[in-house]
A protein has these predicted regions:
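Conserved GNAT acetyl-CoA-binding A-motif
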Residues: 122-132
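Conserved beta-strand in the GNAT
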Residues: 67, 73-82
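A short beta-loop-alpha structural element at the N-terminal edge
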Residues: 16-28
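A short, internal acetyl-CoA/4′-phosphopantetheine-binding micro-motif in the GNAT/acyltransferase core
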Residues: 98-105
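Conserved GNAT-fold acetyl-CoA-binding loop/helix
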Residues: 29-55
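Conserved acetyl-CoA-binding loop-helix of GNAT-fold acetyltransferases
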Residues: 106-119, 146
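A short helix-loop-beta-strand connector motif used in the catalytic cores of GNAT acetyltransferases and
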Residues: 54-67
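Conserved beta-strand-loop-alpha-helix junction that forms the acyl-donor binding cleft
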Residues: 131-140, 159-163
């Protein structure tokens, strides 16, 4: 390129995907709150930057995150962790949450995050890349199906949390 060629700045809708760093935790928490609002689950959110940071960047991290940044602002995140398939005898990559701010949607950010995670899963020798979707989120379901994902109709999520978890972990002895 000639020295007198003007430098162009990236378009306003340009974004970059990168691994999250500790300094992104407050932005990730902000986006988690946005996700909870979208899912109508704000009453369940307890996360704070202080409670999340050790799980992503502590001595024994249990999850990882990617962020999408546009014009210096984190506008999307994907939080994921390794699981394991006994049937395949291979690790898997499980996407816990992905959220793109409403004003940043429709620009390929969500798909780019998913493609990045798929490449990461393949490079780590994972046999599966999985996630859950709310049954009422028909737009997301159609999007995932167009990508080639199978929405598993025969499976349901089971969860024990809070007081029920404590009670089950320490049953009365008799």
């Amino acid at each position: 390129m000639a020295a007198d060629t003007p430098k162009t700045s990236p378009p306003d809708d340009a974004f970059a995907i990168r691994p999250a760093v500790r300094e992104d935790v407050a932005s990730i928490v902000r986006l988690i709150h946005g996700l909870a609002e979208f899912e109508k689950l704000t009453h369940l959110v307890q996360v704070t930057p202080e409670s999340l940071a050790p799980h992503l960047f502590g001595d024994r991290p249990v999850a990882e995150a990617l962020v999408a940044e546009r014009a210096g602002r984190v506008v999307a995140f994907a939080l994921f962790f390794t699981n394991f398939s006994t049937f395949l005898a291979l690790p898997g990559l499980y996407l816990e949450d992905l959220f793109v701010e409403p004003q940043a949607r429709g620009q390929g950010i969500g798909q780019a995050l998913l493609e990045h995670l798929a490449r990461l899963a393949a490079s780590r020798g994972c046999g599966r890349f999985e996630w859950s979707v709310l049954d009422w989120n028909e737009g997301a379901i159609r999007f995932y199906q167009r990508m080639g994902a199978t929405v598993m109709p025969d499976w349901r999520i089971c969860r024990i949390a809070g007081p029920a978890l404590a009670a089950f972990a320490d049953p009365p002895r008799g």
